Amino acid sequence: MFLIIRLLPNLPSKNAGSIASLPLLAKRPLLLWLYVTTAIVISAHFTAYTYIEPFMIDVGHLDPNFATAVLLVFGFSGIAASLLFNRFYRLAPTKFIVVSMSLLMFSLLLLLFSTETMISMFSLVFIWGIGISCIGLSLQMRVLKLAPDATDVATAIYSGIFNAGIGAGALFGNLATTYLGLNEIGYTGAALGLIGFIIFITTHLKYRHTFLLQNK
């Protein structure tokens, strides 16, 4: 540890921002609504993902070992998502986010039907994993673009909201399971995803001019 401290060069943080940056960030509607979108979309994902294993076992009547294998597919889908993000995001950032959210919504909507066969479940989980992984990567990149002068503060807020979305998703999933049934978690997540999708589209169309002015 001592050698690391002595040998590594000093790399001061640039455009990190501080608490004083909060009023400035609060004046950027695209950024604020992106935070709202993040909370809702991540909640949508974890509404279903938190309960995916009992869903596959109790609703899909799948073998527990198979259910565990399905979860591993999420890890492999993350690799594919990283490659897709690196290749396509820079070409059309907004369209990339829209497509990623669409993948998430349709995956959740078709979750119940995918339990019919092993192939359909593996395929859907892989697509679902690509969708949510691309969402996480692209929304974080979007935050950096919208707050280039206070990146540390903006990303810290994003991380906090992301984690809040995880907790909220688990709560929504529990409520859906308790009052609607375990088989409804996909539909509940899809409904939340649709809300986040609509918010993202409408706020982007309404406030995109503020981003152009900000970067002049």
Model-derived features with residue positions:
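Juxtamembrane helix-start elements in MFS-like secondary transporters
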Residues: 62-71, 117, 121, 151-155
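Helix-to-loop junctions at the C-terminal end of transmembrane segments
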Residues: 80-93, 177
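C-terminal membrane-cytosol helix-exit motif in multi-pass small-molecule transporters
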Residues: 1-14, 199-203
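Residue-level signature of mid-helix packing/kink "hotspots" within the transmembrane helices
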Residues: 75-83, 166-167
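A late C-terminal transmembrane helix in Major Facilitator Superfamily
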Residues: 145-184, 188-192
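Extracytoplasmic gate region of multi-pass secondary transporters
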Residues: 29-72, 76, 93
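Intrinsic disorder in cytosolic terminal tails and internal cytosolic loops
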Residues: 145, 202-216
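C-terminal transmembrane helical hairpin of 12-TM major facilitator-type secondary transporters
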Residues: 94-139
